[in-house]
């Protein structure tokens, strides 16, 4: 059995991609798919010296080589769950930057709980769910890969002008008169509250 887009629609794609041409004969980023007890996975060999980034919000360095990330996010106050390795955003996405600066992005099109491992020689996603698709974007730079990703999944709408650069912490206000003072200040500045 294989992947069926009608049975398992994508939550990531803006629209179904269309074929743009033939695959280059020297193409090296070939995913290998596997099933273990009904749980799907995929792995891809990566060129030596490739720097890997992605996977979502976790503590540690941006460079993900040699790391395994659990893709099952949580609201982790004080980074207490799994030592900050499962924070607010989980992304089944890895970007690789080769030694020559050319880059690729890999989107594992699944929302199942998963582990994303980015070893020096391969990238592997092991999900707890059914078969999924893998999309590979291979371009001349990291910027071009991100542009390709936005063409595939879409972009976010522009935030309201008042929100540009604005951060309002709501962790603790005491006493209640302070909350009312802040709300009055918001209204004076025409910021929704």
How would you label these PLM feature ranges?
Residues 1-163, 170-172, 176, 183-188:
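Catalytic and substrate-binding clefts that recognize carbohydrates or anionic sugar/phosphate headgroups
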Residues 192:
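Primarily the dimerization/phosphotransfer
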């Amino acid at each position: 059995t294989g992947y069926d887009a009608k049975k398992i629609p994508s939550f990531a794609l803006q629209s179904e991609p269309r074929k743009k041409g033939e695959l280059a004969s020297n193409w090296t980023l070939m995913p290998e798919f596997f099933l273990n007890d009904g749980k799907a996975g995929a792995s891809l060999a990566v060129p030596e010296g490739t720097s890997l980034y992605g996977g979502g919000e976790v503590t540690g360095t941006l460079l993900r080589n040699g790391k395994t990330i659990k893709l099952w996010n949580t609201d982790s106050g004080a980074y207490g769950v799994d030592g900050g390795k499962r924070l607010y955003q989980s992304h089944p996405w890895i970007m690789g930057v080769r030694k020559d600066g050319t880059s690729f992005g890999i989107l594992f099109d699944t929302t199942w709980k998963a582990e994303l491992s980015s070893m020096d020689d391969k990238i592997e996603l092991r999900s707890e769910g059914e078969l999924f698709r893998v999309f590979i974007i291979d371009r001349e730079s990291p910027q071009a890969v991100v542009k390709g990703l936005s063409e595939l999944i879409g972009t976010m709408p522009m935030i309201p002008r008042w929100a540009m650069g604005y951060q309002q912490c709501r962790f603790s206000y005491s006493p209640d008169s302070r909350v009312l003072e802040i709300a009055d200040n918001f209204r004076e500045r025409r910021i929704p509250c």
